[in-house]
């Protein structure tokens, strides 16, 4: 007997709708960054900077709503949440950094490393969450490595930089030629954030 296909609309829960809000904010922020590069209108970038904290709010709320509605568990929830987080807290902050001047060869390496670490961290969590869960409550007691939404701190840092005019050729700490390419030291913040995400020894209690 053929298996019934999974109806996405019927499977969606209120928590899933909030997760889609998270992904939508991140996606629109990416497009706004691209439009800012073309048009140079600062309002576009301010809107992008606003949407990423809004994505974080959606991310927090979807978990809260899911816990309130335990009777209706989403079959899509965990994967949908991870994919949305990759967009809003991985790709979007990296695009934002590139938009504001991190365009040297080593900068791009750091931005790519950051995104790859975020993807890897979420994949590890999805695979190991059952093993890390408490036997009585079924809840994961701690995060291995920093959660990817902590990248919002980088977004806030870049918002301050944009506010005070320390972007593009005026980025803090300047730029240096390292071998075949240029590096802005600010890009190392992305590399550090990525490394913290994939750390196996850094354990953060889960609220």
Which positions does each model-derived feature cover?
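Hydrophobic alpha-helical transmembrane segments of polytopic
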Residues: 18, 48-55, 110-113, 117, ...
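Multi-pass membrane catalytic core of lipid/isoprenoid biosynthesis enzymes
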Residues: 16-20, 24, 46, 67-125
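Alpha-helical transmembrane segments of polytopic integral membrane proteins
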Residues: 27-30, 54, 58, 63, ...
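Transmembrane alpha-helical segments that form the membrane-embedded catalytic/substrate-channel core
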Residues: 59, 115-128, 188-205
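Interhelical loop and helix-boundary elements at the membrane-water interface
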Residues: 2-23, 64-83, 124-150, 202-207
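Topogenic membrane-insertion module of multi-pass membrane proteins
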Residues: 1-60, 200-202
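Helix-coil boundary and interhelical linker segments in multi-pass alpha-helical membrane proteins
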Residues: 28-50, 87, 93-112, 157-185
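C-terminal membrane-associated helical module and adjoining short loops/tails
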Residues: 1-3, 135, 139-207
